[in-house]
Amino acid sequence: MSHHATSNPDWHGWLCDTLARLREPWPTRWPGLPVVLDACAMQLWRDAEPASEDAQHMLSLARAMTALIETHNAPMPIEPHYHNRLHTADALVSVCGLLRVLQAQGHDTPETWMACLLLAVASHDVQHPGGANAFAQQLEHQSVQVFQELAQEHQLASVWIDRVSQLILRTDPTLVSANHDRVAGRAFVMDLDWSTVLMNEADI
């Protein structure tokens, strides 16, 4: 996932190349979601750890979540066709790319919100059985329950548990249009509403 800095980076080319390289080892030589997550973190923090304690905590929890997903999904004879580990990896890479574009454009991207997004994306389809919701946010609520149990074990601050939970719930496809309407005409600022839009765009 390396990218050489240029005056006009080819972000689309970077994303397409990275997504293609994720597919080369899938599924028989899959390196694991923790490897993908760490590669994204290296891109965003330039090979360093976040300075903020909250961001460190969320990144650590994201690593625990990706490990949990691997433990749950790897033994499956067949994973869900779409909501599988490759999809989660695609979404992680995509939100990483969006954050890097924002950084390159000079936007303020607080590391707490970057870590929050990585954690939310890592968690948004945890133990997804495949298929679609029978009612609004059905499967998203299931993912939130798994996330909250792990977050409480890791003693994540309640404000970030709430924010990550909201981000996961807002990935219900029927809410995407309303999520985008919520920021229409607003300047970009890293908050829950704009982070929701970034997450929706990454959830390809």
Label every PLM stretch briefly:
Residues 1-77:
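Non-catalytic interface/linker regions that flank or bridge core catalytic/transmembrane domains
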